[in-house]
Amino acid sequence: MVVREAMIVPQTVQGGGKGVNGCSLVSNYQNSRDLCLQSAAMEQKSKGVIENCNLGPHDVGVGWKRNSSEGSISSMDSLPCGETVFSPSDPHNSVFRKPRRLGVSESDDESVIDQSQEESLLRKSKRSVMGGTVQPHSAMAQSVDEAAPDHSSTPSDDGKDFPSSRVKFMCSFGGKILPRPSDQQLRYVGGQTRIIGINRDVNFSELRNKMRESFGQCYTFKYQLPDEDLDALVTVSSDEDLENMMEEYDKLEADGSSRLRVFLFPADQDATSFDIDSTGDLRNSEQRYVDAVNGIAESSTRRISDGVLGASPVSSDLLGLELSEPSWGLARGPDAVPMAMLATHHDPNLIHQVPVAHPVSALTGNLSNRSNAPSAPSSAPSSPPLLARNLHGKLPLVGELHQFQYLQDSQFKGVGPQYTGMPSEVAHQDSESYGGSGGSSAASQHEMHYRSTDSRRGPESPPKKFHDALHQDHPITVEQRRLSGTKMPRIGSHGKLTRLSEHSELAPSSRVDSQQMPDIHMAPGELQRLFPQQVPLQQTLWPHAMDTQQDSYRRPDMLQSSGAQPAVSGQQQQGYQPQQQLQHLFRSGLSQTGANHEGAYRQGDQQQQSQQFQEDLHVNPNYIPRSVSSHAIAAGIAAGQSTSYHGSAPSSPRPGFRELPSRHLPGGPQLQHQWTFNGAGYVDQGFGRRVMNYPDQATRSFRLSSSPPRYRDHHPHSEERLHRQAQQVSEPLHHEQVPVSGQLKFETNSVSQAQYDLVPRPQVPQYKGHNPFQEKITSFQDHQEVGDIRRHVLQQGKDNQLLAGQQHLHSILQPQRIDYQESLKQQGDQSIPIHPRFQDGQEKVAEWMVQERALEEEEARKRVLGRIRQAELEEEAAAEAVVSQHKDTHQGVYAGLHLPNDEDLLTSSLGDYPSGNRRNERLESSISNAFPFRHLPPSVLGGYTAPKSRVNPTETSHVAQYVSRPVDTDYLAVAGLRGGGNGQDMRSAALFEVNGLQQTSGYQMPSGPHRLMEERLMPSAFNPITQLQKLRINDNLALNNDMRWSGSEDVRNEPSIPARDRMGGIYEDHHQGLPGLTLGRSAGKLSRPSSNTSIPNLLDETIGEGSLLPSGPSYGTQAQGTNLIDITQSISAIDNPLYSTSYASRLSNTSLGLDSPLVTSGGMLNSSLEGTSFSDYYKIKMGDDLPNAKMPSSKIPSAEDNLSRSSSSSLSELSKSGSEDGLGGQLTMDQRTVDMVVAALDLDRSGSVVQSVLESSDAKEASLSESVHDHSLGKLGSVVGSVGTQSVWPLDSAPTLAAGLWEKKLDEAGMTEETFERHITSDGTTFEELTADDHEVLASTVDKENQEEVRTGLDEPADEDKANSTGLGSDPAAKAIARGLQTIKNADLEELRELGSGTFGTVYHGKWRGTDVAIKRIKASCFAGRPSEQERLIEDFWREACNLGHLHHPNVVAFYGVVADGPGGTLATVTEYMVNGSLKQVLQKKDRTIDRRKRLLIAMDAAFGMEYLHGKNIVHFDLKCENLLVNMRDPHRPICKVGDLGLSKVKHQTMVSGGVRGTLPWMAPELLNGNSSLVTEKVDVFSFGIVMWELLTGEEPYDKMHYGAIIGGIVNNTLRPLIPSWCDPAWRSLMERCWANEPAVRPSFSDIAKELRTMAAALQPKTQAQTQGQSHPHPQMQIV
């Protein structure tokens, strides 16, 4: 009963020590129907005491206990502080509140009861009366909610405060200290955080007891010091420690900005050892972090040992499971698998299937007593769950007991650990369902639960009747099984919990007859009723044995069923019965729960099934049967067969496991086969883990799964994984005999058994249409699996059904979402055993292979020839015309770069054509020309493992369908095309796929010229790329569906990456990459656009890194009616003798335009284009719907404009040298040079070609020119990359200047590289213009608005040639010295004392050869950053030092020189010493007064000095009183000089990037808001306005404000220093204009100087008059 209102009446307590009248209180509960307590008699004196609230400090309050006629005394503190007490005489008017300080004694009398500590845990607690008895302290102190809310600071009615008696702490407990995945910073996650209050004078023993009473156990008390990390907590273990903590509390309390934070850790556990994750496992740390944040209990240790992967992050303790209990028979041995991730609350927006993996091999025979198993209470937390299924008790098992009985006697019981994938609705039941009396009782017990949860489930969620059906063991309708919509939340590698979009509707392709699909939610009895063959349960529920040698983890939502078995020994393998093992697996395969729930084909009429299949194809051409589970193929095929899920939701659970390794299959005659998909050096680009390839194993490798593209913006490598990596296979057609066995065995009279027992595997090239929810493109193997299944099903009906279904073959091969990286191992001598049917007749198999291959090749030949026959005559005419035109000069020259399509790949492997067919000969020739390196070994094209130090694990390039190698950005550096020159953004470089490579486990070194190429094409031979040949754009607008590489026409890709280009973030996100780009040929054949690269239909597809774009062989352009944009650009060789004889340099001497080039030799648009404007070409390229299209400059230099000045070799000589090698037209090379063609093609999202180059790989030239390239091209990389922001084709030629000449031209122009970059970007000036001798032309085009940023003085002495002539080159120190900068030896300096330390260095007063100087030691952190940034900052320092050395002004501190040999290699500046130090020091001296006249003089000096500096284009960036040095020795004329100029630009970079607290009040808004493009010299004017205020008041601005408030106020123009009322109006006006928010409003220093002169002149007469008055104190007397 809840007491609504109580009347407390006093009663005199007799006795009580020293005759003190205490107040006993009797509760008279009103408004209670069943209770009425007697009121006690009350004396008048006591009544008056209560009415007048005259309770003394010795008065003790007591009260009556409920249900007691006499009443028993209890403490008045059972009432909350401030409780209303009514007087019995007038209960409505006479009221008072319980005094807050009741019981606090102010005397030393021991008899006085001090209740302050007892009340500390009970104040403000809402005390409820439980059964009429006031709850004791121990019960109420269990929750931290009642633990010590502090009211000591709340004044009582008399206004008295007690602020010092109690202290407040922010206390955290129950959580863990874990590193945050994003930055590895330690954070306290999980648990609870409360504000607690304790007495200030509490001792450690009392504090420990209070903690034990409040929290129920002993805790270690630790606290965090300010500015310390969580790994440096201070432990409180004594009274002295507690006193120190109180002192730290006082310090923080005085500041008021933060509160001391304390942590409670269990006494038996150490925080550093238990809570801080020091395992080093990133994934484990991330998962623990997520678990802790989401309130999930401690993760059980993941381990990968003995073939078992602990895939669960939740311990069994959380779930209340006792796996070691004998009644369950689940002994936790070394093969135990931790429980799957489960949580406590049901959420309909999350997954349906919660897998629970547990050993079933250890199940005992007697499971019937499981109903007697005790039910363990749930210990799950109450915080929001990570996943959404509830398992309160014992581990549920699927189905009834008798259905598991046969597991003991199974022939597989000795195999080893076997695991069960459990459906979510089974896992949803709690312990009562299995620990109670049976299924019926479980249903009744959960009736209320399902009533409540069904209401909030969603229509697609499993209702209660589905739960009931699991126990009633009757068929479940398809409506109950088709569960869709809710998905598992994805946990990215950085711990973000993301919710996937819901797809409640089934895809059209998923509507299958319910009788064809058993569901994973069916009990085993159901499955056996459908499939009487009694398939062993573990065959349908085992997960796959994962690779134990991989440091990878499976995500729980991928713990789906599979027929793969764990690894077993050879003896165990011999005990298998293959026919029984593989029997009916296809028919009994389990469908997956998710957006598509199609079941396996069951036993029945095969004609009807084939007819149904054809009907589905007619309705949906993209339909493929979802009935084929992964285990159905894994048992018979070593390569994993899997079903593609076209149109399914992104988060639908997929068949997660692949194939059973061949060594796990029964023995028998073996067929030789090899599976090579990744080179030995492949590095998982998702997480940088190296995938181990073991040639003697056939196991899979798995990688960490992650979120779909739309939710992976937080991942460090999301950009790489979001792009489709379209692997274009160039493998010749050959077959691998793969036994499919009885799993696809359907007896028919029309199909030979051999035709479906052994399925041919033609290596048909697959163009993977991009699935927007696909993380990694599946391997070529995965798509072949679907093709085999599809073709096999077609063959089960009629023979002609195979032909009828082939037209849909390409459209149905949709990419499957895979959550791990496919990586088949080379198996060496081990291979897949042949099906027993053919163990005695391998000759039949070989014969059948030959026949089948002939049919396939004939079909491919007809298709290809039929497609190219339409334009045969036109193509031949165009090709012959071009060949004859370039016959003399281009015969045998490198055939150019061409990206293959399906025509190339198919026709290149068709074998010999009829000799009389010119078309076929020409076709083969074109293929050979397109792939001059088709016979290169895998060790060259991707199989090579680059040195670890040169491998970027996040960048990979796929070569063919089986070769992957890390991209080495050092090898592929293209004239510094690295996005700002940082060398980090060379994201994509795709080696051309090479046709003709065989899949072999070992490579035999070729002979002849191929051996020469093998020997020379080693990594050391890679050269910096120096040549760009030609760019071709295909714009055929017609899409021929059957020419798309098996990608359906309706495939689209959602935007994958943020609107920021990978090249340093400088490109705009207009549109996605443009497909259909090919690199045109320079000789031999022309390139026609492929019909499968229609721009409008492919604009929505992302061309990812390493992508190879499909394009067909071309033999003419105008005949096709298409337009081509040929942009002929060439990066000329550097003007250096080392490059003069290179192949790239020689090749650039000829014009490469062949097909109506866009520009002519004069640099203008070609007039033969029939008036087509450049914008029309742009529309052809990008389409009409591209927003904000930026047109390039109309003047684009052609190849003739950019010819190298040093080369005169003819192409005929080059061709001749190539012929000597015996390669003819396939490859141009001589005995000394081997040129490897590398295409570094990267399409930014606006369609611009950022990187498209040819790489010369002359080893000798590369080694000799390394230094020249690094200096010249590396420094200009950012310039090259920055062109792309304004130009569609940022393909300007590289400068032909040597390094020294390049520096000279910049210096002559008075420009820095940054200024030149900005100039290049803004007005499109080409590099060729830079090489002009007349540098005045270049200097005149500098953007005038940005001249303020030019830090270099234009009045430097004209001795730049001195530096170049002396061979100093680009050394900034040497150049500065040559220009007259004085260097001072550190040994000549003597440091006397430290004057001060700042952000950028420490200043000392010292002596330099007897002269007083100021020595500023610059901190090394000022030059921190990437190597390129460090180099640039150092160059800026020397350049500015040189300029400062030439500054001479009386109001600028003299700059004497630079110290280059400081301690530790640090730099220092030596300047003039000012005896009085800085103006700030003068203002801080209270005994020194600065009158108005002196203020004006100091301000005038500072303005004069700044006017001089701005006239020299030098911006100070840090103008404040601290940097204004003064000499106050002359009382009549103080001197002020501007100092601290040595690092103006370095300061700017530091302050803008980080924001320096000591400089914030003087920083202009444009500096604080981060928009550096608005920075001008007016930032110094703003600072000068603040300096004027300092001079006026002598105080520091905003000295008591938080820096965040300062920044916000300045930027928002709401914060400026308060101007005193006595300020002179002229001074006020000038000061306010100086700190105006808009830079344009601020005056220049010239104007400031004028106004200050005016004010000084106006002040001069007054000063003279005062002086005259002082000299004639009695003027009237003089008059008399």
UniProtKB/Swiss-Prot annotation:
Localization per Swiss-Prot or TrEMBL: Cytoplasm
Question: Which residues of the sequence carry a binding annotation for ATP?
Answer: 1395-1403, 1416
Q: Which GO terms describe its biological process?
A: auxin-activated signaling pathway; cellular response to auxin stimulus; regulation of auxin mediated signaling pathway; regulation of photosynthesis; response to absence of light; response to auxin; response to blue light; response to red light
Q: What happens when the gene is disrupted?
A: Growth retardation with hyper-accumulation of starch and reduction of sucrose levels probably due to an impaired synthesis of sucrose and the repression of its catabolism; starch accumulation, but not slow growth phenotype, is suppressed in plants lacking also PGM1. Down-regulated photosynthetic electron transport as a result of the compromised photosynthate metabolism; this phenotype is enhanced in the double mutant missing both PRAF and PPGM1. Plants lacking PRAF exhibit growth and developmental phenotypes such as smaller thallus size and reduced gemmae cup number.
Protein kinase domain spans which residues? 1389-1655
Q: What class of enzyme is it?
A: transferase
- Molecular function via GO: ATP binding; protein kinase activity; protein serine/threonine kinase activity
PTM: Hyperphosphorylated in response to auxin. Its phosphorylation state is also rapidly stimulated by photosynthetic activity (e.g. in response to blue light and red light irradiation); dephosphorylated in the darkness.
- Coiled coil location: none
- Pfam families found in the cross-reference section: PB1 (PF00564), PK_Tyr_Ser-Thr (PF07714)
Q: Please provide the record's keywords in A-Z order.
A: ATP-binding, Auxin signaling pathway, Cytoplasm, Kinase, Nucleotide-binding, Phosphoprotein, Serine/threonine-protein kinase, Transferase
Which catalysed reactions does the entry list for this protein? Answer: L-seryl-[protein] + ATP = O-phospho-L-seryl-[protein] + ADP + H(+); L-threonyl-[protein] + ATP = O-phospho-L-threonyl-[protein] + ADP + H(+)
Gene Ontology CC annotations of this record: cytoplasm
Q: Where is the PB1 domain?
A: 166-267
Q: Which residues form the signal peptide?
A: none
Q: Where is the composition biased (Polar residues)?
A: 641-651
Q: What is its EC number?
A: 2.7.11.1
Q: Which domain of life is it from?
A: Eukaryota
Q: Does the keyword Cytoplasm apply?
A: yes
Q: Which family does it belong to?
A: Belongs to the protein kinase superfamily. Ser/Thr protein kinase family.
* PANTHER family documented for this protein: AT08303P, SERINE-THREONINE PROTEIN KINASE
Q: What does this protein do?
A: RAF-like protein kinase acting as a central mediator of a fast response pathway to auxin involving proteins phosphorylation, and leading to rapid cellular responses including membrane depolarization and cytoplasmic streaming. Required for general growth and developmental process. Photosynthesis signaling kinase involved in the regulation of the sucrose metabolism involving PGM1. Necessary for optimal chloroplast electron transport rate (ETR).
Give the protein's recorded name.
RAF-like serine/threonine-protein kinase PRAF
In its UniProt entry, the species of origin is given as: Marchantia polymorpha
